[in-house]
Amino acid sequence: MSKQGDAAYAWFLKGYNCSQSVVAAFAPQLGLTEETALRLSAGFGAGIGRMREVCGAFCGVVTVLSMVYADPTDPKDKSRMYALVQQAAEQYRARNGGGSIICRELLAKAGAVPTGGTAAEERTADYYKKRPCPELCRLCADLCAEFIAAHPEGRHGFYKEDA
């Protein structure tokens, strides 16, 4: 477990969505304020806008890896970023117990009833009891931390390991 994993777990328990929790856990290393990290990732929660599509925590992984590795000045960088994201998705599928990156599938696998609509659910003890989300936030942040540590090549200068 990483300090970012613990932080992502804590952010989720404070009421932030899954994507916000993962990105905010890396805000210091990315040179972002917490507010910027939370705003940047707000719409990706609950499977992107609560549509229960791609897991919001995994969207946080994509956001963090993009901030660390993407080079918008290099036209060939898209292919490299796509490969990095696909590697991360493969690792997430293998480690999340659901074999998926789809929010509704991960919720269903955990026995939670995936609901749609735009209204965020109230965060109660029962909500946390039936959701895999806090642990998935931890897993995604751990996955990012491990990935970044294992792939120092290609990182851009603004990533601060010690922050």
Identify the function of each model-found stretch.
Residues 16, 44-63:
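Glycine/serine-rich anion-binding loops at beta->alpha junctions
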Residues 85-163:
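C-terminal binding/interaction regions
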